[in-house]
Every structure is written in C-alpha cells, then in structure tokens.
C-alpha cells in the first residue's frame, strides 16, 4: 500500500516510494501498489501513484471502483506485462485462470456509473479542496487527548492514542463507543482511531465529524 490504510494511515516518508521505484527497476522487480483504499479519489487523485508521482508496474484496486455498492476488483498492469500474456500461439490459452464472476455485467455497469459520477460531480477535486480543512481540524485535536501521533493525507487521517495502563486498545474502544453513541463512525485498530470521510463530504459535515470526535476524546 502506498499509504498503509488498515494499519493506521501510515504515510510514507518523503522520497520513500521514489527510492523503492528505483530499487525495483534496478533489480528487475515488479512494483505492485495495493490501492484498494487509496484509489479513486481518497488522496484527491485517481490513484496514490499520481499523488506521489511514482509509476508502479501493477495496481490492485477495488472498493472505490464501484463506491462499494457492488463487489468488484481490478488489476491494472503495464503494457509489456499484458503483452507477455497475449503473445502465445493463437490456438493456446495464455492464462488458464479466471473467476466465476469475472467481468460481471452488473458490477461493470456499477463501475462505469461510479466513474461518471466522480467526474460529473468533481469529487476528486472536492477531496483536494477539503484536505487543508481536514488537516487543520485533525491536528487541532493534539491537545484534546493523550495522543502520541497524528497523521493525515488526502481525506484520510489517524490519531494514535497513548495506551491505557490497564490494557492496549481500551482507550480506542472507549472513543469508538462514545463516537457511535453520538451518531459518528470511526475506525479503531489497536490504539489508533482512523477517519476516512466520503468524497461527497461538505465542510460543515467535516466540522460535525471532528466536533463529535472531540467530544468523544474528551471522555478519556
């Protein structure tokens, strides 16, 4: 993952992915980006690869390709990798592999409709426009609770809570429960609280999310 999502929104250091690309190219290793989370606007671009200006050899994507409405995944590959599968004898099957629901017409229709909505409603641009406000609000929480780190990029961010002496994850569970009771949903992994608002979010909705999270943190 160019930005590790489920692990806690781990943003790579400046130059890390570029150096990884150089090493993979030098040693003939395929660079594969898992963009199931970061793809389709989460970072304000089609893919994180564009945000970081790094061209991988393959991209795995899903979720945002249909906005999660219908299950669908895809793999984007470099042209010469594609050609390696297509240059076999005409009578041969280049890749004897497939899934029962590959190319499912309903999933494909949902994907095409989703891509149209992204473009027509300017949702990637909306994510870019909201990013500074998202960043300001999440870092404004630094004195609201015992935090050890705050990370963000695009419309995703995370707060690392100082572990409760009584046991790991207890503080995060408390924040999750209080946020839920107040009508908000946050992701909890260990002592990390993650936030990934939808691309259609408006500034006032972003404020409501952070106001609710601030109240949940106040209960620690």
What are the residue ranges of the model-derived segments?
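Conserved N-terminal phosphate-binding loop of PLP-dependent enzymes in the Aspartate aminotransferase
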Residues: 1-220
């Amino acid at each position: 993952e160019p930005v590790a999502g489920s692990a806690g929104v781990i943003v790579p250091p400046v130059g890390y992915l570029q150096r990884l690309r150089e090493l993979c190219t030098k040693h003939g290793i395929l660079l594969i980006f898992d963009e199931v989370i970061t793809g389709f606007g989460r970072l304000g671009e089609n893919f994180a690869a564009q945000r970081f200006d790094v061209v991988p050899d393959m991209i795995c994507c899903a979720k945002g390709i249909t906005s999660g409405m219908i299950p669908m995944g895809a793999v984007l590959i470099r042209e010469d990798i594609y050609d390696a599968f297509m240059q076999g004898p005409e009578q041969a099957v280049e890749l004897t592999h497939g899934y029962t629901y590959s190319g499912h017409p309903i999933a494909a229709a949902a994907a095409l409709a989703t891509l149209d909505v992204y473009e027509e409603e300017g949702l990637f641009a909306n994510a870019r426009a909201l990013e500074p406000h998202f960043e300001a609000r999440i870092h404004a929480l630094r004195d609201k609770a015992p935090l050890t780190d705050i990370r963000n990029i695009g419309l995703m961010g995370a707060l690392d809570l100082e572990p409760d002496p009584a046991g790991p994850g207890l503080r995060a569970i408390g924040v999750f429960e209080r946020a839920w009771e107040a009508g908000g949903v946050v992701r909890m992994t260990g002592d990390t609280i993650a936030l990934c608002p939808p691309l259609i979010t408006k500034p006032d909705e972003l404020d409501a999310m952070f106001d609710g999270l601030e109240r949940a943190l106040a209960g620690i």
